[in-house]
Regions:
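Charged, glycine-enriched surface loops/patches
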Residues: 259-272, 281, 293-295
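Adenine-nucleotide phosphate-binding core of ATP-dependent small-molecule kinases
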Residues: 38-66, 175, 186-255, 269-280
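Short, hydrophobic alpha-helical segments
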Residues: 61, 285-297
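Conserved phosphate-binding loops in N-terminal lobes of ATP-dependent enzymes
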Residues: 3-5, 9-75
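Glycine-rich phosphate-binding loop and adjoining helix at the ATP-binding site
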Residues: 43, 47-51, 70-71, 77-139, ...
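Glycine/GP-enriched mid-protein hinge/lid loop-to-helix segment characteristic of carbohydrate kinases
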Residues: 5-7, 21-23, 34-35, 45, ...
Length: 297
């Protein structure tokens, strides 16, 4: 077993799951046998959600002799991360958490002090994880973009990651998330084909044989390129790191993104995260290293 002094529990709260792992802060790595993931109904009432979270946390801590439990949680917003209060609503997930002090409720359920739980924005945790042990490790200024059910954005400056909150920024004739998310893929493919597909993975699976699927990926590459270009021009980073489930289909859009960025004269490296979901876990845990380097915004 690992020595407990350098161990922190990192948690990533997703729209349909909770993923957890103990992190060895000395080696900046996940303790592999501690990794745990379980699915949940984020439309459920408060108590069942907290029950699943608490049971998962206790399950993972039971795998190691950890005398003092420290928890770092990567949470979607809007959320008062310092106080621990959720303001998520009208988003078809976690509405039951709205207005509740989740930090207090969870600490009570776990029988620990609230000071043992730290909560941060999930996109900022992703980028901080990449700084802690990934593609942004040797950079002082970076931007992170998570591509999934929604659009997450974060900025790293002087070693501090913060939520950029660009999902709702003006983009084309709507908001950025309307064009850069798995929801856009489903909507656009249906508009062009009249067929409902479950997710981006399903679209990727048929892209080799489907001109319509390839057309959707081409259009997405144009949207993503424009968004990255605008983000780079605004923040002037040294590196861009992309994560999220949509990056699993990167072969169908990233070559076009890279070519077009070069045509714009942008030669900043754009990396797909090697840490994948582990980035958020590592980033959430890293908030306990020499005080937090993630702004709770």
């Amino acid at each position: 077993m690992e020595a407990s002094e350098g161990i922190v529990l990192g948690i990533d709260i997703g729209g349909s799951h909770i993923t957890l792992a103990l992190v060895n802060m000395d080696t900046q790595s996940i303790i592999e046998h501690s990794y745990y993931r379980t699915y949940l109904n984020s439309r459920a009432k408060l108590e069942p959600i907290i029950d699943i979270w608490a049971n998962a946390i206790n399950n993972v801590f039971a795998k190691e002799q950890v005398e003092y439990k420290r928890i770092g949680m990567a949470m979607p917003g809007p959320f008062d991360y310092e106080a621990g209060i959720s303001y998520i609503k009208d988003n078809k997930k976690y509405d039951a958490l709205y207005g509740q002090n989740i930090k207090n409720i969870l600490a009570h359920r776990l029988k620990i002090d609230t000071s043992q739980i730290r909560m941060f924005n999930d996109a900022a945790c992703f980028l901080q994880g990449e700084v802690f042990a990934g593609a942004a490790k040797n950079y002082s200024k970076a931007i992170g973009i998570t591509l999934g059910t929604g659009l997450g954005t974060a900025i790293l400056s002087n070693g501090v990651a913060r939520d950029a909150n660009l999902w709702s920024s003006d983009f084309k004739d709507a908001k950025a998330e309307d064009y850069i998310s798995s929801r856009w893929f489903a909507k656009r493919y249906f508009e062009l084909s009249g067929i409902n597909l479950l997710d981006v993975r399903a679209l990727s699976d048929i892209a080799a044989e489907s001109p319509v699927a390839r057309a959707v990926f081409k259009e997405f590459s144009e949207n993503l390129t424009l968004f990255i270009k605008q983000f780079i021009e605004a923040e002037q980073p040294e590196v861009v790191v992309l994560g999220g489930n949509i990056t699993k289909a990167a072969a169908w859009y990233m070559p076009a993104v890279s070519r077009t960025l070069k045509r714009y004269g942008i030669d900043i490296p754009v990396h797909i995260s090697d840490l994948k979901e582990n980035a958020a876990l590592l980033g959430a845990a890293s908030c306990w290293q020499n005080n937090s380097k993630i702004l709770a915004v």
